[in-house]
From Swiss-Prot:
The active site is at 517 (proton acceptor). The modification N6-carboxylysine is found at residue 124. This is Dihydroxy-acid dehydratase. GO terms for molecular function: 2 iron, 2 sulfur cluster binding; dihydroxy-acid dehydratase activity; magnesium ion binding. GO terms for cellular component: cytosol. The gene is ilvD. InterPro entries: Dihydro-acid_dehy_C, DihydroxyA_deHydtase, DiOHA_6PGluconate_deHydtase_CS, ILV_EDD_C, ILV_EDD_N, IlvD/EDD_N. Mg(2+) binds at residues 81, 123-124, 491. Binds 1 [2Fe-2S] cluster per subunit. This cluster acts as a Lewis acid cofactor. GO terms for biological process: isoleucine biosynthetic process; L-valine biosynthetic process.
Length: 616
């Protein structure tokens, strides 16, 4: 029988000092012996996806206390990728994932907490907390802040739905008037919550459902809707049950590594491909799998991508649907239901509610359930009122979207495409693979060949795009922006958005060892591995080299002879200490970022730290 971890600090005469300090936090004699549960919050006024979380930790804590536990809340940092985008702040985004994971480990282990409720939402916060949860392997439930409502504005006598990416594209489009750009900017992000499309934050919060670590509705129920409060109340009650099951009944099925198993990771990736999730999810799932000591690699993702169809299409891949529409169609469980009926899921998995996949679908799939309260929950919709308050409205759609032929979520028979929304490509400068979000690629450019325009920083590429130096047919290559080379593996949302602003969204490709925002669409290929700073062949590409992209056949090829590449590699190595570094780039890199770079691996490993350098 496992012993409560917290007993280390609450039991025995020699722990009198620790108990004295616990008493100073409000604990009493009656609390010593109860499970101490960490409420891991991420409230900040910097991030719209987290601005409403201040009081939600207290909400969870009250339920924990009522159920017989002791709740202790702490906060992690949270970076807003959209605000950090397009300048030096983006260097800090991905490294913040490791800091978040470490900070959770530090707090939980330093104070011997028995379990956790993780209140996350945006891009690196959910992955960081997920990595920590699987590293610590104590009972955990995730409950995120929820998606933002889609923006809406009237243009050309039509009401159109908007998001952050629309504001970026129109802000740089010379054909768009100042007044229209201003109107879009003011309308794009109307409420608190994670940005309203299938961007990284919402993708990851959906994936926690598929991994079994969050409750049905977590990924899609709007931040502003009153129904979302129930997820927080349930999490506080349920975590005490899970904690007691493990520590008092020796039930290891309550632990996250037994819930988020290899089969669950495969289901999560299957969901990701089917819903056209952010390419960043590949990075984060690979990293989380390593923390769980699960053998889940790019090879597994490649195999899944070849057999899973695209059953859901959401912004940025279309302007028709946002997360509020996914929820109306049944949310994550709705997509999982269609995947299950297509025979594409592992059914022998459980979630934090203790339900198997078939049981979850029977209870929560809108195409199967007889429970009117579940159907009512999935009718929760937007109010269209600007707010930063959680649970501030109770609007509902008149009906569910259960049209699996023409609706937001499709059945296998009516799939958007037989190919899924993500693909792994391999070739002579991406030997370990690279990732493309096929959901956002126009059919006309699934095969594309063009001359390279090479840039050794995102800034130079942006200047060239906006300066008209990139023309139709070009393949923009941005290198030395990987985990080590950046450092920090910047997102390339501005270059991809500005290609659209210049009318080149369907006429150019962009390839990088950096990564892309979940808001990116178009022929945007990232995570090229190995990265240039690690000696990857992307560092050998020269201006004018032809690059052939063949998504249907999963290929990407630099059309240069092996002999020429060998000669270029020899010349690169001859640069000595300057080898595999940018030739003409000035960038101030802090000590903290240099420390990150010294241990960073390439994207095919999840951009995690190289344990071999630490003797691990």
């Amino acid at each position: 029988m496992p012993k409560y971890r917290s007993a280390t600090t609450t039991h025995g005469r020699n722990m009198a000092g620790a108990r004295a300090l616990w008493r100073a936090t409000g604990m009493t004699d009656a609390d010593f012996g109860k499970p101490i549960i960490a409420v891991v919050n991420s409230f900040t006024q910097f991030v719209p996806g987290h601005v409403h979380l201040r009081d939600l930790g207290k909400l969870v804590a009250e339920q924990i206390e009522a159920a017989g536990g002791v709740a202790k809340e702490f906060n992690t940092i949270a970076v807003d990728d959209g605000i950090a985008m397009g300048h030096g702040g983006m260097l800090y985004s991905l490294p913040s994932r490791e800091l978040i994971a470490d900070s959770v480990e530090y707090m939980v282990n330093a104070h011997c907490a028995d379990a956790m409720v993780c209140i996350s939402n945006c891009d690196k916060i959910t992955p960081g907390m997920l990595m920590a949860s699987l590293r610590l392997n104590i009972p955990v439930i995730f409950v995120s802040g929820g998606p933002m409502e889609a923006g809406k504005t009237k243009l050309s006598d039509q009401i159109i739905k908007l998001d952050l990416v629309d504001a970026m594209i129109q802000g740089a489009d010379p054909k768009v008037s100042d007044s229209q750009s201003d109107q879009v900017e003011r309308s794009a992000c109307p409420t608190c919550g994670s940005c309203s499309g299938m961007f990284t934050a919402n993708s990851m919060n959906c994936l926690t459902e598929a991994l079994g670590l969050s409750q049905p509705g977590n990924g899609s129920l709007l931040a502003t809707h009153a129904d979302r409060k129930q997820l927080f109340l349930n999490a506080g009650k349920r975590i005490v049950e899970l904690t007691k099951r493990y520590y008092e009944q020796n039930d290891e099925s309550a632990l996250p590594r037994n819930i988020a198993s290899k089969a669950a990771f495969e289901n999560a990736m299957t969901l990701d491909i089917a819903m056209g999730g952010s390419t960043n999810t590949v990075l984060h799932l690979l990293a989380a799998a390593q923390e769980a000591e699960i053998d889940f690699t790019m090879s597994d993702i490649d195999k899944l991508s070849r057999k899973v169809p695209q059953l859901c299409k959401v912004a940025p891949s279309t302007q028709k649907y946002h997360m509020e529409d996914v929820h109306r169609a049944g949310g994550v469980i709705g997509i999982l239901g269609e995947l299950d009926r297509a025979g594409l899921l592992n059914r022998d998995v459980k979630n934090v509610l203790g339900l198997t996949l078939p049981q979850t679908l029977e209870q929560y799939d809108v195409m199967l359930t007889q429970d009117d309260s579940v159907k009512n929950m999935f009718r929760a919709g937007p109010a269209g009122i600007r707010t930063t308050q959680a649970f501030s409205q109770d609007c509902r759609w008149d009906s569910l979207d259960d049209d699996r032929a023409n609706g937001c979520i499709r059945s296998l028979e009516h799939a958007y495409s037989k190919e899924g929304g993500l693909a792994v490509l391999y070739g002579n400068f991406a030997e370990n693979g690279c990732i493309v979000k096929t959901a956002g690629v126009d059919d006309s450019i699934l095969k594309f060949t063009g001359p390279a325009k090479v840039y050794e920083s995102q800034d130079d590429a942006v200047e060239a795009i906006l300066g008209g130096k990139v023309v139709a047919g070009d393949v923009v290559v941005i290198r030395y922006e990987g985990p080590k080379g950046g450092p920090g593996m910047q997102e390339m949302l501005y270059p991809t958005s500005f290609l659209k602003s210049m009318g080149l969204g369907k006429a150019c490709a962009l390839i990088t060892d950096g990564r892309f925002s979940g808001g990116t669409s178009g022929l945007s290929i990232g995570h090229v591995s190995p990265e240039a700073a690690s000696g990857g062949s992307i560092g050998l590409i020269e201006d004018g080299d032809l690059i052939a992209i063949d998504i249907p056949n999963r290929g990407i090829q630099l059309q240069v002879s092996d002999a020429e590449l060998a000669a270029r590699r020899e010349a690169q190595e001859a640069r000595g200490d300057k080898a595999w570094t940018p030739k003409n780039r000035e960038r101030q890199v802090s000590f903290a970022l240099r420390a990150y770079a010294s241990l960073a691996t390439s994207a095919d490993k999840g951009a995690v730290r190289d344990k071999s350098k630490l003797g691990g």
